[in-house]
Amino acid sequence: MTSRGFRLDQDNRLNNFAIEPPVYVDSSVQAGWTEYAEKMNGRFAMIGFVSLLAMEVITGHGIVGWLLSL
C-alpha cells in the first residue's frame, strides 16, 4: 500500500524511506576538467611559448639568462 510516497511494512508500520528516487548514472567519465578549460589552457600555453621564443629572438638571451641579468 502506497500513499504519497509512504509505504506500510508487514506489521502495518509506516516506512517513509521505502520508496527511493531513481539513481542517475552518467556514463561519461570526467575528472573535473571540461573541454573548454582544456582548450583555454592549451591556448594560454601556446601564447606563453610563442612569447618566450619571441623574447629570445629579440633579446638574444634565453629566459634563464634574461632573469639572471635583472
UniProtKB/Swiss-Prot annotation:
Disruption phenotype annotation: No visible growth effect of the single mutant; double hliA-hliB deletions are out-competed by wild-type in high light (500 umol photons/m(2)/s). Quadruple hliA-hliB-hliC-hliD deletions die rapidly in high light but grow normally in normal light (40 umol photons/m(2)/s). Quadruple mutants are sensitive to norflurazon. In a quintuple hliA-hliB-hliC-hliD-hemH deletion chlorophyll half-life decreases 2-fold while the half-life of PSII proteins does not change; photosystem II assembly intermediate RC47(1) is missing (RC47(1) is PSII monomer without CP43). De novo chlorophyll synthesis is very slow.
Keywords: Membrane, Photosynthesis, Photosystem II, Pigment, Stress response, Thylakoid, Transmembrane, Transmembrane helix
Entry GO terms, CC: photosystem II; plasma membrane-derived thylakoid membrane; thylakoid membrane
Location relative to the cell: Cellular thylakoid membrane
Motif Chlorophyll-binding motif, residue range(s) on this chain: 38-43
Lumenal, thylakoid side: 59-70
GO molecular function annotation: chlorophyll binding; pigment binding
Residues on Cytoplasmic side: 1-30
InterPro entries recorded: Chloroa_b-bind
GO biological process: energy quenching; photosystem II assembly
Chief localization: membrane
Regions that span the bilayer: 31-58
Membrane-related topology note: Single-pass membrane protein
Induction (UniProt): Transcription strongly induced in the absence of photosystem I (PSI). Increased translation in the absence of PSI (at protein level). Expressed at very low levels during growth under normal light (40 umol photons/m(2)/s), induced under high light (500 umol photons/m(2)/s for 6 hours) with maximal expression by 1 hour and decreasing after, after growth at 4 degrees Celsius for 6 hours and less induced after nitrogen or sulfur deprivation (at protein level). Upon return to normal light protein levels drop rapidly.
Function of the molecule: Involved in photosystem II (PSII) assembly and/or repair under high light stress; probably important for quick stress responses. HliB-HliC heterodimers associate with PSII assembly intermediates with CP47 (psbB) and bind chlorophyll and carotenoids in a 1:0.6 ratio. They probably protect against photo-oxidation during assembly. Complex binds mostly beta-carotenoid, but minor amounts of echinenone and beta-crytoxanthin are also detected. The complex efficiently quenches chlorophyll fluorescence, contributing to photoprotection. The Hlips might regulate tetrapyrrole biosynthesis, maybe at the level of aminolevulinic acid synthesis and probably stabilize PSII assembly intermediates.
Family note: Belongs to the Hlip family.
Assembly and binders: Forms heterodimers with HliC, these are associated with photosystem II (PSII) assembly intermediates containing CP47 (psbB) but not CP43 (psbC). Other studies detect it in PSII complexes with CP43. Associates with PSII assembly intermediates close to CP47 and PsbH probably on the periphery of PSII; requires PsbH to bind to PSII. Cofractionates in an approximately 100 kDa fraction the thylakoid membrane with HliA.
Protein name per UniProt: High light-inducible protein HliB
Organism in which the protein naturally occurs: Synechocystis sp. (strain ATCC 27184 / PCC 6803 / Kazusa)
Gene name linked to the record: hliB
